[in-house]
Amino acid sequence: MKTLILVVIALMVIEVKSDGYLMVRAGREKGCKIWCVINNEYCDKDCKLKGGNYGYCYFWKLACYCEGLPTSSPDIWTYEKNTCST
């Protein structure tokens, strides 16, 4: 029983991370993915500024992809948040 309680407490303490495309949150391109061609350094820097672990330029999608962002981060692009073409 003590082990079960310990496991439950440990799961509550562990922070859940998620991966996804970085999103522009202001200006003319608000709601769009942050685009790139081959600039891994820019994507990595921007990812880390937003609380992620590692970012890179996903060449086939021409967008910055970030790994290890907090799940509650508003910087993760989703279809629901896509206001790029409006």
Swiss-Prot record:
Question: From the UniProt record, which GO molecular function terms apply?
Answer: sodium channel inhibitor activity; toxin activity
The protein's location, in the record's own words, is:
Secreted
What's one GO BP annotation on this UniProt entry? defense response
Q: Could you list this entry's UniProt keywords, alphabetically sorted.
A: Disulfide bond, Ion channel impairing toxin, Neurotoxin, Secreted, Signal, Toxin, Voltage-gated sodium channel impairing toxin
Q: Which PROSITE patterns match?
A: LCN_CSAB (PS51863)
Domain LCN-type CS-alpha/beta, chain residue ranges per copy = 19-85
| Coiled-coil stretches | none
What the protein does comes down to: Binds voltage-independently at site-4 of sodium channels (Nav) and shift the voltage of activation toward more negative potentials thereby affecting sodium channel activation and promoting spontaneous and repetitive firing.
Q: What is this protein called?
A: Neurotoxin LmNaTx34.2
State the species of origin: Lychas mucronatus (Chinese swimming scorpion)
* Record lineage: Eukaryota, Metazoa, Ecdysozoa, Arthropoda, Chelicerata
